[in-house]
Amino acid sequence: MSHHVTFNDLPQGGEKFEPAKGGKIIGALGLVGVLGLVASAFFFFTKTDTFAYSWLFAVFFTFTFVVGGCFWILLHSASNSSWGVAVRRIWENLANMILAMGIFAAPLLLPQVQKPLYEWMGHHRTAMEHAAHADHPTTVKESLHHMSVENPHLHALVTKFGYMNLNTWFSWYTRFFLYFLILWYIARTLRGKSLKQEQDGDIKHTISARQFSCRWLLFYALTVTFAAYDWLVGLDYLWFSTMWGVYIFAGCAWASMGLTILVITWLRGLGYMKKVVTDEHYHLMGKLLFAFTVFWAYIAFSQYFLIWYANITEETRFYLTRNTEGWRWVSIFIVIGHFVGPFLLLLSQPRKKNPVVVSLVCLWILFMHLVDIYWNVIPERGPSLGIGVWVPGAWVQDIAALCAVFGTMGFLYLRGLAKYSLYPWRDPRLIESVNVIN
Protein backbone atom coordinates (compact mmCIF):
# COMPACT_ATOMS: atom_id res chain seq x y z
CA MET A 1 0.00 0.00 0.00
CA SER A 2 1.20 3.52 -0.76
CA HIS A 3 0.48 5.03 2.68
CA HIS A 4 -0.49 4.16 6.22
CA VAL A 5 -4.26 3.60 6.34
CA THR A 6 -6.26 5.18 9.17
CA PHE A 7 -9.90 4.85 10.24
CA ASN A 8 -10.63 8.04 8.30
CA ASP A 9 -9.60 6.30 5.07
CA LEU A 10 -12.24 3.59 5.54
CA PRO A 11 -15.98 4.06 4.97
CA GLN A 12 -18.10 4.71 8.07
CA GLY A 13 -20.08 1.57 8.83
CA GLY A 14 -17.75 -0.66 6.86
CA GLU A 15 -18.56 -2.05 3.42
CA LYS A 16 -21.90 -3.76 2.76
CA PHE A 17 -22.04 -6.28 -0.04
CA GLU A 18 -24.71 -5.78 -2.69
CA PRO A 19 -25.78 -9.18 -4.11
CA ALA A 20 -26.74 -7.56 -7.40
CA LYS A 21 -23.06 -6.86 -8.11
CA GLY A 22 -22.24 -10.55 -7.89
CA GLY A 23 -25.45 -11.61 -9.55
CA LYS A 24 -23.91 -13.84 -12.22
CA ILE A 25 -22.04 -16.17 -9.90
CA ILE A 26 -24.75 -16.11 -7.23
CA GLY A 27 -27.43 -16.80 -9.82
CA ALA A 28 -25.38 -19.59 -11.37
CA LEU A 29 -24.89 -21.25 -7.98
CA GLY A 30 -28.61 -20.95 -7.28
CA LEU A 31 -29.50 -22.53 -10.62
CA VAL A 32 -26.98 -25.34 -10.12
CA GLY A 33 -28.39 -25.92 -6.65
CA VAL A 34 -32.00 -26.15 -7.85
CA LEU A 35 -31.14 -28.52 -10.71
CA GLY A 36 -29.07 -30.61 -8.32
CA LEU A 37 -31.91 -30.80 -5.80
CA VAL A 38 -34.37 -31.93 -8.48
CA ALA A 39 -31.98 -34.60 -9.76
CA SER A 40 -31.15 -35.67 -6.20
CA ALA A 41 -34.83 -36.12 -5.35
CA PHE A 42 -35.20 -38.37 -8.40
CA PHE A 43 -32.17 -40.49 -7.51
CA PHE A 44 -33.18 -40.66 -3.85
CA PHE A 45 -36.46 -42.38 -4.70
CA THR A 46 -35.20 -44.53 -7.58
CA LYS A 47 -31.62 -45.48 -6.62
CA THR A 48 -31.51 -44.98 -2.87
CA ASP A 49 -28.74 -47.49 -2.13
CA THR A 50 -26.15 -46.03 -4.48
CA PHE A 51 -27.29 -42.43 -4.08
CA ALA A 52 -26.83 -42.60 -0.29
CA TYR A 53 -23.06 -42.61 -0.87
CA SER A 54 -23.34 -39.70 -3.28
CA TRP A 55 -25.22 -37.66 -0.71
CA LEU A 56 -22.78 -38.47 2.08
CA PHE A 57 -19.88 -37.43 -0.16
CA ALA A 58 -21.51 -34.10 -1.06
CA VAL A 59 -22.61 -33.34 2.49
CA PHE A 60 -19.26 -34.12 4.07
CA PHE A 61 -17.32 -32.23 1.40
CA THR A 62 -19.39 -29.09 2.05
CA PHE A 63 -19.31 -29.69 5.82
CA THR A 64 -15.50 -29.45 5.80
CA PHE A 65 -15.63 -25.82 4.65
CA VAL A 66 -18.07 -24.84 7.38
CA VAL A 67 -16.05 -26.44 10.17
CA GLY A 68 -12.89 -25.04 8.59
CA GLY A 69 -14.30 -21.52 8.85
CA CYS A 70 -15.13 -22.20 12.49
CA PHE A 71 -11.56 -23.32 13.12
CA TRP A 72 -10.02 -20.17 11.68
CA ILE A 73 -12.16 -17.90 13.88
CA LEU A 74 -11.26 -19.94 16.96
CA LEU A 75 -7.56 -19.94 16.12
CA HIS A 76 -7.56 -16.24 15.25
CA SER A 77 -9.23 -15.35 18.55
CA ALA A 78 -7.34 -17.79 20.77
CA SER A 79 -3.94 -16.75 19.40
CA ASN A 80 -4.80 -13.04 19.76
CA SER A 81 -3.87 -12.54 16.12
CA SER A 82 -4.41 -9.09 14.66
CA TRP A 83 -3.65 -9.62 10.97
CA GLY A 84 -6.78 -11.72 10.48
CA VAL A 85 -9.19 -9.03 11.65
CA ALA A 86 -9.61 -7.80 8.08
CA VAL A 87 -10.76 -11.21 6.82
CA ARG A 88 -12.45 -12.53 9.98
CA ARG A 89 -15.98 -11.74 8.81
CA ILE A 90 -15.51 -14.11 5.85
CA TRP A 91 -14.84 -16.94 8.33
CA GLU A 92 -17.74 -15.88 10.54
CA ASN A 93 -20.14 -16.08 7.61
CA LEU A 94 -18.78 -19.48 6.68
CA ALA A 95 -19.06 -20.90 10.20
CA ASN A 96 -22.60 -19.61 10.60
CA MET A 97 -23.76 -21.76 7.69
CA ILE A 98 -23.86 -24.68 10.13
CA LEU A 99 -27.65 -24.73 10.55
CA ALA A 100 -28.19 -24.88 6.79
CA MET A 101 -25.57 -27.62 6.73
CA GLY A 102 -27.59 -29.52 9.31
CA ILE A 103 -30.62 -29.50 7.02
CA PHE A 104 -28.62 -31.10 4.23
CA ALA A 105 -27.16 -33.66 6.65
CA ALA A 106 -30.63 -34.60 7.97
CA PRO A 107 -31.23 -37.37 5.36
CA LEU A 108 -28.40 -39.31 7.03
CA LEU A 109 -30.86 -39.86 9.90
CA LEU A 110 -33.24 -41.84 7.67
CA PRO A 111 -33.08 -45.66 7.98
CA GLN A 112 -33.35 -46.12 4.20
CA VAL A 113 -30.20 -44.00 3.80
CA GLN A 114 -28.38 -45.60 6.72
CA LYS A 115 -29.04 -49.16 5.53
CA PRO A 116 -26.69 -49.09 2.50
CA LEU A 117 -24.17 -46.78 4.19
CA TYR A 118 -23.67 -48.26 7.63
CA GLU A 119 -23.81 -52.04 7.81
CA TRP A 120 -23.34 -51.97 11.57
CA MET A 121 -26.64 -50.15 12.02
CA GLY A 122 -28.48 -53.00 10.34
CA HIS A 123 -26.91 -55.49 12.74
CA HIS A 124 -27.83 -53.28 15.68
CA ARG A 125 -31.44 -53.00 14.58
CA THR A 126 -31.62 -56.78 14.22
CA ALA A 127 -30.15 -57.17 17.70
CA MET A 128 -32.70 -54.69 19.07
CA GLU A 129 -35.53 -56.73 17.56
CA HIS A 130 -34.13 -59.95 19.01
CA ALA A 131 -33.78 -58.33 22.43
CA ALA A 132 -37.35 -56.99 22.29
CA HIS A 133 -38.82 -60.42 21.47
CA ALA A 134 -36.58 -62.52 23.70
CA ASP A 135 -38.21 -64.91 26.21
CA HIS A 136 -36.18 -63.37 29.04
CA PRO A 137 -34.76 -59.87 29.61
CA THR A 138 -31.88 -59.42 27.17
CA THR A 139 -29.82 -56.34 26.36
CA VAL A 140 -28.96 -55.32 22.82
CA LYS A 141 -25.30 -55.98 23.55
CA GLU A 142 -26.10 -59.52 24.73
CA SER A 143 -28.17 -60.07 21.61
CA LEU A 144 -25.24 -58.90 19.47
CA HIS A 145 -23.01 -61.31 21.34
CA HIS A 146 -25.35 -64.20 20.51
CA MET A 147 -25.42 -63.12 16.85
CA SER A 148 -21.60 -63.07 16.76
CA VAL A 149 -21.54 -66.83 17.35
CA GLU A 150 -22.75 -67.32 13.77
CA ASN A 151 -20.97 -64.26 12.37
CA PRO A 152 -17.53 -63.78 14.02
CA HIS A 153 -17.16 -60.32 12.44
CA LEU A 154 -19.85 -59.06 14.82
CA HIS A 155 -17.48 -59.51 17.75
CA ALA A 156 -16.13 -56.09 16.75
CA LEU A 157 -19.56 -54.54 17.30
CA VAL A 158 -19.80 -56.15 20.73
CA THR A 159 -16.42 -54.66 21.63
CA LYS A 160 -17.31 -51.24 20.19
CA PHE A 161 -20.87 -51.21 21.55
CA GLY A 162 -20.17 -48.35 23.96
CA TYR A 163 -19.59 -46.07 20.96
CA MET A 164 -21.28 -47.70 17.96
CA ASN A 165 -24.87 -48.07 19.10
CA LEU A 166 -28.32 -46.67 18.41
CA ASN A 167 -30.08 -46.95 21.75
CA THR A 168 -27.95 -45.50 24.57
CA TRP A 169 -27.54 -41.94 25.86
CA PHE A 170 -24.35 -41.65 23.79
CA SER A 171 -25.80 -43.15 20.62
CA TRP A 172 -25.00 -42.21 17.03
CA TYR A 173 -28.17 -40.09 16.93
CA THR A 174 -27.27 -38.20 20.11
CA ARG A 175 -23.83 -37.38 18.78
CA PHE A 176 -25.23 -36.30 15.41
CA PHE A 177 -27.31 -33.54 17.00
CA LEU A 178 -24.55 -32.70 19.47
CA TYR A 179 -22.08 -31.98 16.66
CA PHE A 180 -24.31 -29.36 15.07
CA LEU A 181 -25.32 -27.91 18.43
CA ILE A 182 -21.69 -27.38 19.49
CA LEU A 183 -20.61 -25.90 16.17
CA TRP A 184 -23.68 -23.66 16.05
CA TYR A 185 -23.01 -22.43 19.58
CA ILE A 186 -19.37 -21.63 18.78
CA ALA A 187 -20.21 -19.82 15.54
CA ARG A 188 -23.17 -17.94 17.02
CA THR A 189 -21.27 -16.84 20.14
CA LEU A 190 -18.25 -15.51 18.26
CA ARG A 191 -20.47 -13.78 15.71
CA GLY A 192 -22.44 -12.22 18.57
CA LYS A 193 -19.31 -10.82 20.20
CA SER A 194 -18.15 -9.46 16.86
CA LEU A 195 -21.46 -7.67 16.24
CA LYS A 196 -21.56 -6.23 19.76
CA GLN A 197 -18.16 -4.70 19.10
CA GLU A 198 -19.59 -2.92 16.06
CA GLN A 199 -21.96 -1.10 18.42
CA ASP A 200 -19.42 0.22 20.93
CA GLY A 201 -15.93 -0.57 19.57
CA ASP A 202 -14.87 -1.89 22.98
CA ILE A 203 -11.77 -4.12 23.18
CA LYS A 204 -13.50 -6.17 25.90
CA HIS A 205 -15.33 -8.13 23.19
CA THR A 206 -11.99 -9.15 21.68
CA ILE A 207 -10.76 -10.30 25.10
CA SER A 208 -14.01 -12.19 25.70
CA ALA A 209 -13.74 -13.89 22.30
CA ARG A 210 -10.18 -14.95 23.10
CA GLN A 211 -11.17 -16.46 26.43
CA PHE A 212 -14.14 -18.24 24.86
CA SER A 213 -12.03 -19.62 22.00
CA CYS A 214 -9.35 -20.97 24.33
CA ARG A 215 -12.02 -22.94 26.19
CA TRP A 216 -13.92 -24.19 23.16
CA LEU A 217 -11.04 -25.19 20.90
CA LEU A 218 -10.93 -28.56 22.67
CA PHE A 219 -14.66 -29.14 22.15
CA TYR A 220 -14.27 -28.13 18.51
CA ALA A 221 -11.45 -30.64 18.01
CA LEU A 222 -13.47 -33.44 19.61
CA THR A 223 -16.53 -32.54 17.54
CA VAL A 224 -14.71 -32.68 14.20
CA THR A 225 -12.92 -35.89 15.17
CA PHE A 226 -16.03 -37.73 16.33
CA ALA A 227 -18.08 -36.55 13.35
CA ALA A 228 -15.38 -37.80 10.97
CA TYR A 229 -15.41 -41.18 12.71
CA ASP A 230 -19.19 -41.49 12.80
CA TRP A 231 -19.86 -40.53 9.19
CA LEU A 232 -16.82 -41.91 7.36
CA VAL A 233 -15.07 -44.55 9.47
CA GLY A 234 -18.51 -46.00 10.21
CA LEU A 235 -18.77 -47.02 6.55
CA ASP A 236 -16.62 -50.02 7.51
CA TYR A 237 -17.16 -50.86 11.16
CA LEU A 238 -14.12 -53.16 11.23
CA TRP A 239 -11.71 -50.42 10.12
CA PHE A 240 -10.02 -47.95 12.45
CA SER A 241 -7.27 -45.34 12.37
CA THR A 242 -5.77 -43.28 15.17
CA MET A 243 -4.86 -40.54 12.65
CA TRP A 244 -8.28 -40.09 11.09
CA GLY A 245 -9.52 -37.08 13.04
CA VAL A 246 -6.34 -35.09 12.40
CA TYR A 247 -6.33 -36.14 8.74
CA ILE A 248 -9.84 -34.77 8.21
CA PHE A 249 -9.10 -31.64 10.23
CA ALA A 250 -6.03 -30.87 8.10
CA GLY A 251 -8.15 -31.07 4.96
CA CYS A 252 -10.83 -28.83 6.51
CA ALA A 253 -8.35 -26.10 7.43
CA TRP A 254 -6.55 -26.35 4.07
CA ALA A 255 -9.64 -26.18 1.88
CA SER A 256 -11.45 -23.51 3.91
CA MET A 257 -8.42 -21.21 3.71
CA GLY A 258 -8.36 -21.76 -0.04
CA LEU A 259 -12.04 -20.85 -0.24
CA THR A 260 -11.42 -17.76 1.90
CA ILE A 261 -8.80 -16.50 -0.54
CA LEU A 262 -11.09 -17.12 -3.51
CA VAL A 263 -14.02 -15.27 -1.91
CA ILE A 264 -11.81 -12.31 -1.00
CA THR A 265 -10.36 -12.15 -4.52
CA TRP A 266 -13.88 -12.24 -5.95
CA LEU A 267 -15.05 -9.45 -3.63
CA ARG A 268 -12.01 -7.31 -4.45
CA GLY A 269 -12.77 -7.82 -8.12
CA LEU A 270 -16.21 -6.32 -7.46
CA GLY A 271 -14.64 -3.30 -5.77
CA TYR A 272 -14.90 -4.34 -2.11
CA MET A 273 -12.21 -4.59 0.58
CA LYS A 274 -9.53 -3.00 -1.61
CA LYS A 275 -8.32 -0.75 1.20
CA VAL A 276 -8.60 -3.49 3.80
CA VAL A 277 -6.96 -6.56 2.23
CA THR A 278 -3.47 -6.18 0.78
CA ASP A 279 -0.82 -8.39 -0.78
CA GLU A 280 0.51 -8.90 2.75
CA HIS A 281 -2.73 -10.65 3.70
CA TYR A 282 -2.44 -12.88 0.65
CA HIS A 283 1.10 -13.69 1.69
CA LEU A 284 0.02 -14.61 5.22
CA MET A 285 -2.88 -16.74 4.01
CA GLY A 286 -0.62 -18.31 1.40
CA LYS A 287 1.86 -19.28 4.10
CA LEU A 288 -0.92 -20.95 6.05
CA LEU A 289 -1.96 -22.79 2.89
CA PHE A 290 1.61 -23.97 2.46
CA ALA A 291 1.82 -25.04 6.12
CA PHE A 292 -1.34 -27.13 5.90
CA THR A 293 -0.23 -28.61 2.58
CA VAL A 294 2.78 -30.05 4.39
CA PHE A 295 0.81 -30.90 7.53
CA TRP A 296 -1.83 -32.84 5.57
CA ALA A 297 0.90 -34.76 3.72
CA TYR A 298 2.61 -35.61 7.01
CA ILE A 299 -0.61 -36.92 8.55
CA ALA A 300 -1.64 -38.80 5.40
CA PHE A 301 1.76 -40.49 5.16
CA SER A 302 1.78 -41.26 8.89
CA GLN A 303 -1.60 -42.96 8.63
CA TYR A 304 -0.48 -45.01 5.64
CA PHE A 305 2.86 -45.90 7.23
CA LEU A 306 1.33 -47.00 10.54
CA ILE A 307 -1.23 -49.21 8.80
CA TRP A 308 1.38 -50.66 6.43
CA TYR A 309 3.80 -51.37 9.27
CA ALA A 310 1.20 -52.98 11.56
CA ASN A 311 -0.24 -55.03 8.66
CA ILE A 312 -3.51 -55.73 10.49
CA THR A 313 -6.21 -57.13 8.21
CA GLU A 314 -8.97 -54.84 9.52
CA GLU A 315 -6.81 -51.78 8.80
CA THR A 316 -5.13 -52.69 5.50
CA ARG A 317 -8.47 -53.22 3.75
CA PHE A 318 -8.89 -49.43 3.48
CA TYR A 319 -5.81 -49.05 1.28
CA LEU A 320 -6.24 -52.34 -0.53
CA THR A 321 -9.66 -51.16 -1.73
CA ARG A 322 -8.15 -47.88 -2.92
CA ASN A 323 -5.34 -49.63 -4.76
CA THR A 324 -7.69 -51.80 -6.80
CA GLU A 325 -8.29 -51.17 -10.51
CA GLY A 326 -8.86 -47.48 -11.30
CA TRP A 327 -8.73 -46.33 -7.69
CA ARG A 328 -4.98 -46.90 -7.68
CA TRP A 329 -4.48 -44.10 -10.18
CA VAL A 330 -6.68 -41.81 -8.10
CA SER A 331 -4.48 -42.60 -5.09
CA ILE A 332 -1.33 -41.68 -7.02
CA PHE A 333 -3.00 -38.54 -8.36
CA ILE A 334 -3.85 -37.43 -4.80
CA VAL A 335 -0.21 -37.77 -3.72
CA ILE A 336 0.91 -35.57 -6.61
CA GLY A 337 -2.00 -33.15 -6.79
CA HIS A 338 -2.73 -32.76 -3.09
CA PHE A 339 0.87 -32.37 -1.95
CA VAL A 340 3.59 -32.13 -4.60
CA GLY A 341 1.85 -29.60 -6.84
CA PRO A 342 0.67 -27.13 -4.15
CA PHE A 343 3.96 -27.53 -2.28
CA LEU A 344 6.02 -26.44 -5.28
CA LEU A 345 3.63 -23.67 -6.31
CA LEU A 346 3.43 -22.15 -2.82
CA LEU A 347 7.16 -22.25 -2.10
CA SER A 348 7.80 -18.91 -3.77
CA GLN A 349 7.06 -15.73 -1.80
CA PRO A 350 6.16 -13.65 -4.90
CA ARG A 351 3.59 -16.25 -5.94
CA LYS A 352 1.97 -16.17 -2.50
CA LYS A 353 1.77 -12.37 -2.69
CA ASN A 354 0.20 -12.38 -6.15
CA PRO A 355 -3.62 -12.49 -5.77
CA VAL A 356 -4.16 -13.95 -9.24
CA VAL A 357 -1.57 -16.71 -8.90
CA VAL A 358 -2.51 -17.73 -5.37
CA SER A 359 -6.21 -17.71 -6.32
CA LEU A 360 -5.52 -20.09 -9.21
CA VAL A 361 -3.65 -22.35 -6.80
CA CYS A 362 -6.69 -22.19 -4.50
CA LEU A 363 -8.96 -23.35 -7.30
CA TRP A 364 -6.70 -26.38 -7.67
CA ILE A 365 -6.72 -26.89 -3.90
CA LEU A 366 -10.52 -26.98 -3.81
CA PHE A 367 -10.53 -29.50 -6.65
CA MET A 368 -7.99 -31.72 -4.90
CA HIS A 369 -9.93 -31.53 -1.65
CA LEU A 370 -12.98 -32.68 -3.61
CA VAL A 371 -11.00 -35.62 -5.00
CA ASP A 372 -9.71 -36.47 -1.52
CA ILE A 373 -13.18 -36.62 0.06
CA TYR A 374 -14.48 -38.56 -2.95
CA TRP A 375 -11.61 -41.04 -2.56
CA ASN A 376 -12.45 -41.50 1.11
CA VAL A 377 -16.17 -42.15 0.62
CA ILE A 378 -17.02 -43.58 -2.79
CA PRO A 379 -14.68 -46.65 -2.96
CA GLU A 380 -16.77 -48.18 -0.16
CA ARG A 381 -19.94 -48.10 -2.29
CA GLY A 382 -19.36 -50.95 -4.71
CA PRO A 383 -17.95 -53.54 -2.26
CA SER A 384 -20.52 -52.69 0.44
CA LEU A 385 -23.42 -53.13 -1.98
CA GLY A 386 -21.88 -56.26 -3.52
CA ILE A 387 -21.74 -54.65 -6.96
CA GLY A 388 -17.98 -54.57 -7.53
CA VAL A 389 -15.22 -52.01 -7.38
CA TRP A 390 -17.06 -49.51 -9.57
CA VAL A 391 -20.80 -48.84 -9.82
CA PRO A 392 -21.61 -48.12 -13.49
CA GLY A 393 -23.15 -44.70 -14.05
CA ALA A 394 -23.15 -43.75 -10.36
CA TRP A 395 -20.90 -40.75 -11.08
CA VAL A 396 -24.00 -38.94 -12.39
CA GLN A 397 -25.57 -39.31 -8.95
CA ASP A 398 -22.38 -37.99 -7.36
CA ILE A 399 -22.46 -34.85 -9.52
CA ALA A 400 -26.17 -34.32 -8.82
CA ALA A 401 -25.63 -34.53 -5.06
CA LEU A 402 -22.62 -32.20 -5.22
CA CYS A 403 -24.56 -29.62 -7.23
CA ALA A 404 -27.48 -29.84 -4.81
CA VAL A 405 -25.50 -29.39 -1.61
CA PHE A 406 -22.48 -27.29 -2.61
CA GLY A 407 -24.42 -25.22 -5.14
CA THR A 408 -27.21 -24.35 -2.72
CA MET A 409 -24.85 -23.72 0.19
CA GLY A 410 -22.67 -21.53 -2.03
CA PHE A 411 -25.71 -19.53 -3.09
CA LEU A 412 -26.84 -19.03 0.52
CA TYR A 413 -23.33 -18.15 1.67
CA LEU A 414 -22.72 -15.46 -0.95
CA ARG A 415 -26.18 -14.00 -0.42
CA GLY A 416 -25.50 -13.97 3.32
CA LEU A 417 -22.45 -11.74 2.86
CA ALA A 418 -24.85 -8.81 2.46
CA LYS A 419 -26.21 -9.10 6.01
CA TYR A 420 -23.32 -7.36 7.78
CA SER A 421 -20.22 -5.35 6.91
CA LEU A 422 -17.60 -7.40 5.05
CA TYR A 423 -15.13 -6.69 7.84
CA PRO A 424 -15.47 -5.77 11.56
CA TRP A 425 -15.11 -2.03 11.02
CA ARG A 426 -15.07 -1.07 14.73
CA ASP A 427 -12.57 -3.65 15.89
CA PRO A 428 -9.79 -1.62 17.59
CA ARG A 429 -7.18 -3.75 15.83
CA LEU A 430 -8.54 -3.30 12.31
CA ILE A 431 -5.98 -0.63 11.38
CA GLU A 432 -3.18 -2.82 12.67
CA SER A 433 -4.50 -5.59 10.42
CA VAL A 434 -4.91 -3.34 7.38
CA ASN A 435 -1.31 -2.10 7.67
CA VAL A 436 0.23 -5.48 8.47
CA ILE A 437 3.70 -6.19 7.09
CA ASN A 438 5.28 -9.63 7.32
Predicted region positions:
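Central hydrophobic cores of alpha-helical transmembrane segments in multi-pass inner-membrane proteins
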Residues: 3-10, 36-37, 62-81, 183-188
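Long, contiguous internal "core" modules enriched in hydrophobic/ aromatic residues
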Residues: 13, 20-40, 128-334
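Membrane helical hairpin/interfacial module
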Residues: 52, 56, 62-118
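Hydrophobic cores of alpha-helical transmembrane segments in multi-pass inner/ER membrane proteins
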Residues: 66-73, 103-107, 176-188, 250-265, ...
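Central hydrophobic cores of alpha-helical transmembrane segments
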Residues: 105, 356-367
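Aromatic-anchored segments of alpha-helical transmembrane domains
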Residues: 222-226, 363-374
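Short, highly charged, low-complexity non-transmembrane loops/tails of multi-pass membrane proteins
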Residues: 422-438
